[in-house]
Amino acid sequence: MLAWVIIVSIITAGLSVALVGMNATKAQGNAAASALESVARQPEAGDQINRMLLFALAFIETIMIFTLTVALILLFANPLLGKL
């Protein structure tokens, strides 16, 4: 049973970081592309668009950091191993 918990934890950590990483990268690319398009349409609003883009990128990156934190907890301080 202990081996299965370790194997599933490793697979879960790897898949979660990979999937969230791919989606976060795609979301950041879409946000940057939309911001560039918005600045091209309204150059006078560039400062406000840039500020909002930075907030959006920070929120997207926060999701990735939380996922990485959970994956590292699963790998190195797995709470499921103490219950077995």
From Swiss-Prot:
Q: Which domain of life is it from?
A: Bacteria
The answer to whether keyword Metal-binding applies is no
What Gene3D superfamilies would the database entry show? lithium bound rotor ring of v- atpase
Q: Which InterPro entries match?
A: ATP_synth_F0_csu (IPR000454), ATP_synth_F0_csu_DDCD_BS (IPR020537), ATPase_proteolipid_c-like_dom (IPR002379), F/V-ATP_Csub_sf (IPR035921)
List the residues marked with site Reversibly protonated during proton transport: E61
Q: Which Pfam families match?
A: ATP-synt_C
Subcellular localization, per the record?
Answer: Cell inner membrane
Keyword set, alphabetical order = ATP synthesis, Cell inner membrane, Cell membrane, CF(0), Hydrogen ion transport, Ion transport, Lipid-binding, Membrane, Transmembrane, Transmembrane helix, Transport
Q: Name one GO cellular component term.
A: proton-transporting ATP synthase complex
Disulfide bonding pattern of the chain: none
Molecular function terms from GO: lipid binding; proton-transporting ATP synthase activity, rotational mechanism
PROSITE patterns documented for this protein: ATPASE_C
Instruction: Enumerate the transmembrane spans.
Output: 1-21, 53-73
* Main subcellular localisation: membrane
Q: Which residues form a coiled coil?
A: none
Q: How does this protein sit in the membrane?
A: Multi-pass membrane protein
Binding partners and assembly: F-type ATPases have 2 components, F(1) - the catalytic core - and F(0) - the membrane proton channel. F(1) has five subunits: alpha(3), beta(3), gamma(1), delta(1), epsilon(1). F(0) has three main subunits: a(1), b(2) and c(10-14). The alpha and beta chains form an alternating ring which encloses part of the gamma chain. F(1) is attached to F(0) by a central stalk formed by the gamma and epsilon chains, while a peripheral stalk is formed by the delta and b chains.
Report the protein's function.
F(1)F(0) ATP synthase produces ATP from ADP in the presence of a proton or sodium gradient. F-type ATPases consist of two structural domains, F(1) containing the extramembraneous catalytic core and F(0) containing the membrane proton channel, linked together by a central stalk and a peripheral stalk. During catalysis, ATP synthesis in the catalytic domain of F(1) is coupled via a rotary mechanism of the central stalk subunits to proton translocation.
Family assignment from sequence similarity = Belongs to the ATPase C chain family.
Q: What name goes with this protein?
A: ATP synthase subunit c
Tell me what organism the protein belongs to. Answer: Dictyoglomus thermophilum (strain ATCC 35947 / DSM 3960 / H-6-12)
